[in-house]
Amino acid sequence: MKLMELTPWETPAVIDYKKTMEQFGVKPIVDVLGDLKEEHHFFRRNIILGHRDFERIVDAIKNNKEFAVVSGMMPSGKMHFGHKMVVDLLKFYQKYTDNINIPIADLEAYWARNMSFETTKELALNEYITNYIALGLDPEKINVYLQSKYQKVKDLALILSKRTNWSEMKAIYGFKGETNIGHVFAPIVQVADILHPQLDENLSPEPKPVVVPVGIDQDPHIRLTRDIANRAKEFKFIPPSSTYHRFMTGLLGGKMSSSKPETAIFLTDDEKTVKKKIFSAKTGGRETLEEHKKYGGVPEECVVYELFLYHLILDDKELAEIYQKCRSGELTCGKCKKMAYERVVEFLKDLKEKREQAKEIAVKILEGKY
């Protein structure tokens, strides 16, 4: 059997999550959630399906212990509903900790994607930080920073770079001879992003659990970070925990991507654009209305149902009713798309108003003046 190849820069269009988790030693999260399963619909609906050492975070939440969260961003395009998933998770964690760290990977963007620092900063400010605040993140509980400007992380990356070598980096990431050295070093900066909450400003140990919520494509960073944490004995690091969520399917099937506007609903899309995208979306309906009513739809293959599942319907009973009506053929694709369109438009209209209020706060956060 051919093994799955994962890198943070090339996500497969289709992922067999079960096989991939088994291959890389990621455990099913349902085994450790306990009562926490009812605290977020991502847990209840198996949208978050895997973990490494998440029991540490469950223990911290249950017993009111200190822990930190790290969730980086590499702005390469407009923010869409797939990105919103991360904010929904951070909103969950901010109920239990005020130590939420959001690195902006401008160094990685420069080295790996040839993006200028100015472009990355502008995208981060206008598309991401502003939306993060508008979506409900508490500015008092987040530490947002540019990698290129945060000396603590850069210093730590230089120190930790001694704890790995070219052979390991090549094996994990598949780097080639023509890969620039900055790109090779970028994962070490990510390691420092993840581990720095366990140190004070003088890089002295302040060990605490850290959780990193990611897609499975980011697991190479997690594995490297955990290995380096165990090697750097002088810092007394607790290896970071991680959770793994499913990717949202693109509107036309396959991957959702900022570089392919037709595959995603952006948080700044207007009403006309949303309507066109949703009514063109791939569904789990049959080829004809007659067949759909006779055999029923397949919501598991429907991108519109996925919007309900991930974002638009938080009430489990209401979602179950839509599922059953689709399966029975009672609910047609046209009616379902109309419902999704109306809910998305209502959501984006409200978000637009909140975004106007969030812009000034976002600027202050990025300038370190909030």
Swiss-Prot record:
The keyword Protein biosynthesis applies. A motif ('HIGH' region) lies at residues 75-83. It is an enzyme of class 6 (ligase). Keywords: Aminoacyl-tRNA synthetase, ATP-binding, Cytoplasm, Ligase, Nucleotide-binding, Protein biosynthesis. GO terms for molecular function: ATP binding; tryptophan-tRNA ligase activity. GO terms for biological process: tryptophanyl-tRNA aminoacylation. A motif ('KMSKS' region) lies at residues 255-259. It is found in: Cytoplasm. Belongs to the class-I aminoacyl-tRNA synthetase family. NCBIfam families: PRK12285.1-2, trpS. This is Tryptophan--tRNA ligase. It comes from Methanocaldococcus jannaschii (strain ATCC 43067 / DSM 2661 / JAL-1 / JCM 10045 / NBRC 100440). The gene is trpS.
